């Protein structure tokens, strides 16, 4: 079964006549002519071909048996295993022996699969190293080479070297990589920047978009579209000229806007929603509506407690993963219950700000190349998006940006995602000033800014602080002239990370910052990860700007 743009489509996403158990949703549109097979990965010279099938597709009931039996503590382990022989032979063997009285599932898996390698197990940090030295010495530990790919594994081969976040994440991730690149540039690792630039361009060429990560099970979704920001970084640091990426930026834009022209007001298709006034805004989406391979058991359990059709819940869980904020009160109908997730009904402020940046980048590079018609078209698109955001996502009463629930036609919760319009230059100065006041009073702590002001047990909420949010807030407020707030966030975050490093001698994915005593951040569906790519990247860049704490 090939990946498709829509597999097992959610009944709520259909507007065609089929037999359904649930009432059709008048808001959603599905177009038969837009369903086409995912492109197969191309061969990379000297490397085995990547397999476009996900482990759940390929191993069928064996996959479900392994995940249901919890033979590994982390649901991501089995999808990341690589087969020792042809996967079809493994499935045939499993079907022959699974009903034997002495069948041992764990031994079967160990005999037929290579378990994921933990690359950093032998690395021990030197407690005498400064924070800067520690980060610079971690880049080789977090670097993966193309030859690491094993035939038939879920890992998608890439033509060049790349950085992984660390811990359970042994592949490259889309939006993580941008913040990691900030540190690579500061460390003088132009070699790795060039490799990663080529890898992301290659993925757009071969898949039509940048997947969530380079795994087959990530092909059905992307992540926050930050390639335009990467291109800007490549240009600023002299790594690659921006002009060479214009076609790639246009291809990514086409992916995010697919189906837009066929929509009428109050309809949605994939990532696009046409608002009541005819304007276009975007949402997060995943083309599949099945449990995620990497969190299969967790998704099945969540759906059981939802009281909704399971495929609806799976789609929203997947879309939440596409947002990068997996998970947060931003996506929940009931902030204390993950089963109430409704990601696809929210118009996110950060996503639309990133797409504003993408539209602006296409316009700017088109101008450099003398393509005046394209420049004018995309300036108009960026302007229209900013106007729509101001109509639907700006809360003038409270002076903040908020996500918008397009189904209920009401504003949603306030979070640190509200700072992204400043980072991409979409806000006006009055909006920036008012948002600064809200951040000071509602999100700022002695350790940095909180992801949100709500305690839900989810990792992208209070009490946690995340490196990418700090960076965008620092630069965003400084861009609008609020150096005082930007510098305060920067120094607070550096103090948080350095204090934890001095005590634990490591960098981690997220930090508990709510009470001024930095410690490990909690929440989420997996244990805290160390490494950690984007924390290293942001902190290394801040050290270059502010010095070591």
UniProtKB/Swiss-Prot annotation:
Pfam families: Trehalase. InterPro entries: 6-hairpin_glycosidase_sf, 6hp_glycosidase-like_sf, Cyt_trehalase, Glyco_hydro_37, Glyco_hydro_37_CS. The active site is at 326 (proton donor/acceptor), 509 (proton donor/acceptor). GO terms for cellular component: cytoplasm. It is found in: Cytoplasm. It catalyses: alpha,alpha-trehalose + H2O = alpha-D-glucose + beta-D-glucose. The keyword DNA-binding does not apply. Keywords: Cytoplasm, Glycosidase, Hydrolase. Its EC number is 3.2.1.28. One of its GO terms (molecular function) is alpha,alpha-trehalase activity. The keyword Metal-binding does not apply. NCBIfam families: PRK13270.1, PRK13271.1. Monomer. Hydrolyzes trehalose to glucose. Could be involved, in cells returning to low osmolarity conditions, in the utilization of the accumulated cytoplasmic trehalose, which was synthesized in response to high osmolarity. This is Cytoplasmic trehalase. It comes from Escherichia coli (strain 55989 / EAEC). The gene is treF.
């Amino acid at each position: 079964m090939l990946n498709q743009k829509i597999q097992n489509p959610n009944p709520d996403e259909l507007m065609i006549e089929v037999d359904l158990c649930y009432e059709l949703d008048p808001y959603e549109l599905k177009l038969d002519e837009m369903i086409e097979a995912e492109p197969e990965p191309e061969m990379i010279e000297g490397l085995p071909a990547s397999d476009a099938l996900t482990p759940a597709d390929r191993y069928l009931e064996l996959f479900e048996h392994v995940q249901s039996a919890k033979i590994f503590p982390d649901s991501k382990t089995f999808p990341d295993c690589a087969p020792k022989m042809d996967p079809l032979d493994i499935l045939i063997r499993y079907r022959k022996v699974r009903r034997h009285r002495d069948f041992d599932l764990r031994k079967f898996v160990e005999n037929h699969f290579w378990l994921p390698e933990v690359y950093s197990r032998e690395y021990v940090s030197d407690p005498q190293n400064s924070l800067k030295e520690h980060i610079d010495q971690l880049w080789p530990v977090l670097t993966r080479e193309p030859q690491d790919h094993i035939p038939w594994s879920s890992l998608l081969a890439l033509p060049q070297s790349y950085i992984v976040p660390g811990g359970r994440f042994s592949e490259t991730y889309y939006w993580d990589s941008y913040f990691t690149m900030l540190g690579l540039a500061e460390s003088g690792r132009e070699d790795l920047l060039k490799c990663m630039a080529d890898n992301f361009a290659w993925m757009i060429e071969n898949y039509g978009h940048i997947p969530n990560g380079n795994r087959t099970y990530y092909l059905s979704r992307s992540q926050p579209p930050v390639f335009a920001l990467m291109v800007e970084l490549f240009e600023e640091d002299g790594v690659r000229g921006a002009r060479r990426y214009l076609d790639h930026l246009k291809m990514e834009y086409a992916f995010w806007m697919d189906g837009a022209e066929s929509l009428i007001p109050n309809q949605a298709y994939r990532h696009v929603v046409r608002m009541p006034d005819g304007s276009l805004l975007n949402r997060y989406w995943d083309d599949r509506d099945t449990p995620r391979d990497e969190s299969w058991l967790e998704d099945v359990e969540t759906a059981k407690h939802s009281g909704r059709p399971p495929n609806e819940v799976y789609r929203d869980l997947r879309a939440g993963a596409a947002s990068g904020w997996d998970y947060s009160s931003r996506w929940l109908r009931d902030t204390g219950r993950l089963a109430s997730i409704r990601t696809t009904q929210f118009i996110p402020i950060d996503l639309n700000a990133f797409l504003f940046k993408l539209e602006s980048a296409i316009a700017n590079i088109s101008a450099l190349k003398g393509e005046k018609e394209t420049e004018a078209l995309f300036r108009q698109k960026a302007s229209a998006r900013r106007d729509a955001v101001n109509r639907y996502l700006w809360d003038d009463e409270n002076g903040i940006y908020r996500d918008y629930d397009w189904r209920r036609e009401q504003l949603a919760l306030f979070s640190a995602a509200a700072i992204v319009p400043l980072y991409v230059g979409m806000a006006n100065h009055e909006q920036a000033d008012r948002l600064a006041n809200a951040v000071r009073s509602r999100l700022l702590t002695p350790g940095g800014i909180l992801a949100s002001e709500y305690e839900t047990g989810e990792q992208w909420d209070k009490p946690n602080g995340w490196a990418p949010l700090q960076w965008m807030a620092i630069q965003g407020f400084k861009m609008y002239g609020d150096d005082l707030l930007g510098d305060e966030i920067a120094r607070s975050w550096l103090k948080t990370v350095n204090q934890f490093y001095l005590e634990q001698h490591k960098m981690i994915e997220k930090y508990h910052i709510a009470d001024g005593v930095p410690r490990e951040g909690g929440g989420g569906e997996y244990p805290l990860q160390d490494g950690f790519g984007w924390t290293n990247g942001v902190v290394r860049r801040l050290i270059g700007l502010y010095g070591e704490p």
